[in-house]
């Protein structure tokens, strides 16, 4: 996971990330769909995030593909984006990522569930268990949700 640091010149990746975020801010769905195919995980992640933020209806098929991405954070971002597009079918995917070995992914999943309102309530037990997470922010989110859903 640290191989990126072996390359001294990150200007290409930096430029690409600026471009994908700028495309998101401009609501340029066509560019975001192209960036979602990038070999760079950071670029795919931000494309998925912005497709959801902008509720890009043309992005649904791409987001469905991204829910099977090899990178867990991208799967979470895609599932959250689909929910924003009115597709709740990947809620279970978010719940499955709560206990991801990468603690940030678990926190991202919990935060996405929190943003969905009461939809995650059916998974209350698994969310409540996250109050014992090693990551403080995951514990906080799980505690907020558990308290809210009593």
Where are these regions (language model features)?
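Short inter-helical turns and helix N-cap capping residues of alpha-solenoid HEAT/ARM repeat scaffolds
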Residues: 10-11, 39-40, 70-71, 101-102, ...
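N-terminal segments that cap or nucleate solenoid repeat domains
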Residues: 20-46, 50
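Amphipathic alpha-helical scaffolding segments comprising HEAT/armadillo-like alpha-solenoid repeats
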Residues: 1-6, 25-37, 56-68, 87-99, ...
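Alpha-solenoid repeat junctions
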Residues: 21-25, 51, 55, 82, ...
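Residue-level detector of extended alpha-helical repeat arrays and alpha-solenoid scaffolds
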Residues: 14-15, 44, 75, 106, ...
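Boundary/linker elements of alpha-helical solenoid repeat scaffolds
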Residues: 11-20, 47-48, 78-79, 110
């Amino acid at each position: 996971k640290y191989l990126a640091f072996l390359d001294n010149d990150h200007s290409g990746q930096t430029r690409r990330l600026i471009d994908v975020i700028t495309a998101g801010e401009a609501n340029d769905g066509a560019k975001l769909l192209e960036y979602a195919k990038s070999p760079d995980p950071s670029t795919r992640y931000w494309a998925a995030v912005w497709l959801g933020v902008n509720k890009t209806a043309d992005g649904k098929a791409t987001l469905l593909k991204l829910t099977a991405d090899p990178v867990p954070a991208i799967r979470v971002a895609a599932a959250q984006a689909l929910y924003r597009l009115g597709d709740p079918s990947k809620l279970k995917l978010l719940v499955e990522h709560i206990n991801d070995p990468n603690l940030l992914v678990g926190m991202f999943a919990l935060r996405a569930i929190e943003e969905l309102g009461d939809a995650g309530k059916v998974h209350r037990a698994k969310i409540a268990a996250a109050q014992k997470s090693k990551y403080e922010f995951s514990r906080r989110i799980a505690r907020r949700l558990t308290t809210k859903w009593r």
